[in-house]
Amino acid sequence: FNREKSIKRAESREKALDKIERIEKPIDEKTDMHITLEPEITSGNDVLSVKGLSKSYEHKLFSNIDFQIKRGEKVALIGNNGTGKTTILKIINGIVDADAGEIKLGSNVEIGYYDQEHQNLDPDKTLFDEIADAYPNLKATKIRNVLAAFLFTDDDVFKRIRDISGGERGRVSLAKLMLSNANFLILDEPTNHLDIMSKEILESAINSYTGTVLYVSHDRYFINKTAS
C-alpha cells in the first residue's frame, strides 16, 4: 500500500514538473531564421558591365567573357565545378585580379558580398564582436536582436567563430550581409549548409529584395525560385 502511494506521489510530481516546464517555455520561441534584405540607396540602372574577362591559373578557367546586369535583376552564374564561377565573383568584388578584361560598376552601386568559405569572419572573434566590429555604431541590444533573428541567443553570442559549425557561420555571414543594406548582392553558394526552412526564408528575402543580385549556386530549386 505504501509503495503504491509512493509511486502515485512520484507520478504526480512528474506531471507537475512537466506542467511547469510547459508553462515556462516561451510560446513565441524563435525556431526559424529571420532575414530582411533592404538597400539603403538605389543604384543607377546599369549596375555591372563585364567585358573581355579572362583568367587562368595552371589552366585556363575562362576567356573573353562579356555580360551586363541591370538594376533589379537576379542573375545566377551556373556551370560545372572548376569553371571559374567563384573566381568571377571574386574578380568583381576586387579580391582576385583578372588576367584581362574590364569590370565597370554603375553609379551608386554598393556591394554586399557573401563568401561561401566565410573568410570575411575572424575565427578568433566571438559572434557578438564580429558584428560589433563590422558595425561599430550598433548598440549592444540591436546586435543581440540581430543575432537572435539568426537563431543565436543567450550565451551563443559569446561563442568564437572557430567553434561554430559551417551552417552557423553561414548564418553569421548572412546577418552581416543584412546589416550592410547594400544594393548589389554578390553571393557565393548562399544555401550551402542551410536547412530547408532557412533556404526557403532566404529565397523569400531575395525575391522581396528591390536591389540587384548576382550569385553562384548548385541548388537548382533555389535557382528556379530566385533567378530572373
What is each of the regions a protein language model found here?
Residues 35-228:
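ABC ATP-binding cassette signature C-motif
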Residues 1-34, 38, 99-100, 136-138, ...:
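Extended, highly charged alpha-helical segments
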